[in-house]
């Protein structure tokens, strides 16, 4: 029997900076995902934020009023029945943080595209994030028209038509548009119902070898704590397939960098799982869907400050290969989106530096060989990925990395 309080999917929250993504996650979960001091100061998300919500259905109410993320029904005050939990991945909307958004997209089973009704649609990062969802293959999308409390009904309807015109011909063409006010809690039931219908739990293979994409890693020890109380390093991310158990012997790849006879080598890290947290619950067994915190016996110095973000965790000797040079089939977009002027995208050139997002890993590489639609790239940092993985490709345009297309690894 599935525990309804353990999240079964990850839902990305994407869109332009300051369109209300973090406020929306707070309204749904009660968690403010900007915990980083710099984020609070600047009022923008810098790292990926995570929060879980349980969906409740009230048996007395009908339609959208029956749905909420609160045990007490907001419409009638009766008791709601919990039927499902989800994890939200709050991605930064600022153009300089596109790499962070792309690394988060690897964890997403579906996404909410948040568009503020108070601004003209589309804004630059609204375009860029929708293009990113299209490139990494996220098809299950709910569009959230936010901030409807600060505009008139006519402006909201005009903005709705702008949104529909913008998504025409994209993967979000048939996505529902849900108008909400996160500040006032308006229409949250309709949003919960739409998320439940559009982003169901995907089919999972429980017998597959486990593969967990690491998006965060940390040292949970307080400065100056007694050495007897020191806890091992913790990694956070999402299990994309298979099952993990407490006490499993695991390997993390590419691992850590070492120098052997003046050559840099990457050595896989092996350790044992000491604890697993799914959402805020301690569990013995982890299944795909939702975000996990995995406690290990690693030296916390190895995991502090997201040092292992972008790596892959699984059973010893069973992980996908590690690549320091890749060949991929490339599909480039026609124009650069997200910039003020939309430049035509030129073909990839020999010796050109590129930023590649593979799973949760973000690495830089240099083009060593180009053919008609395939390219070879020498990576600065190796990545652990399966053949056939999708790779988001960005190039420097002006002083920014801009998304220009996608590749398929090893073709």
Regions found by a protein language model. Name each.
Residues 83-87, 91-97, 106-128, 134-157:
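Conserved Switch II/interswitch segment of TRAFAC-class P-loop GTPases
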Residues 1-99, 108:
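P-loop NTPase switch module centered on the Walker A-proximal segment
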Residues 10-13, 151-153, 299-411:
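C-terminal effector modules of nucleic-acid-centric enzymes and ribosome-associated factors
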């Amino acid at each position: 029997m599935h525990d309804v309080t353990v999240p079964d999917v990850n839902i990305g929250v994407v869109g332009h900076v300051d369109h209300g993504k973090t406020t929306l996650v707070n309204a749904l979960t009660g968690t403010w995902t900007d915990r980083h001091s710099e984020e609070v100061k600047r009022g923008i998300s810098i790292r990926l934020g995570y929060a879980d919500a349980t969906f409740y259905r009230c048996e007395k109410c009908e339609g959208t009023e029956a749905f909420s993320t609160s045990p007490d029904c907001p419409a009638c005050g009766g008791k709601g029945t919990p039927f499902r939990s989800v994890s939200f991945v709050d991605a930064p909307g600022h153009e300089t943080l596109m790499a962070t958004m792309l690394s988060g997209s690897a964890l997403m089973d579906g996404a909410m595209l948040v568009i503020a009704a108070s601004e003209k649609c589309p804004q630059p990062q609204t375009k860029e994030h929708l293009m990113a969802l299209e490139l990494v293959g996220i098809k299950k999308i709910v569009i959230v028209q936010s901030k409807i409390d600060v505009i008139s009904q006519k402006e909201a309807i005009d903005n709705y038509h702008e949104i529909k015109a913008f998504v025409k011909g994209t993967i979000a063409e048939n996505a529902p548009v849900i108008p909400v006010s996160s500040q006032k809690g308006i229409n949250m039931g309709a949003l919960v119902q739409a998320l439940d219908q559009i982003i169901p739990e995907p089919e999972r293979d429980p017998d597959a070898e486990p593969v967990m994409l690491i998006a965060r890693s940390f040292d949970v020890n307080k400065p100056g704590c007694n050495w007897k109380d020191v806890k091992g390093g913790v990694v956070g991310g999402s299990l994309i397939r298979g099952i993990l158990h407490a006490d499993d012997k695991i390997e993390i790849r590419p691992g850590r960098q070492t120098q052997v006879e003046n050559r840099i080598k990457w050595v896989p890290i092996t350790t044992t799982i000491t604890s697993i947290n799914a959402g805020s619950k301690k569990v013995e067994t982890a299944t795909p869907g939702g975000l996990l915190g995995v406690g290990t016996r690693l030296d916390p110095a190895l995991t502090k400050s997201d040092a292992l973000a972008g790596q892959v965790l699984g059973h010893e000797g069973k992980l996908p290969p590690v690549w320091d040079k890749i060949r991929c089939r490339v599909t480039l977009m026609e124009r650069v989106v997200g910039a003020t002027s939309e430049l035509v995208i030129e073909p990839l050139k020999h010796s050109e530096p590129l930023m590649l997002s593979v799973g949760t890993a973000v690495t830089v590489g240099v083009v060593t060989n180009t053919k008609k639609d395939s390219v070879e790239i020498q990576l600065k940092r190796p990545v652990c990925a399966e053949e056939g993985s999708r790779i988001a490709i960005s190039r420097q345009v002006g002083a920014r990395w801009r998304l220009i297309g996608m590749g398929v690894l090893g073709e």
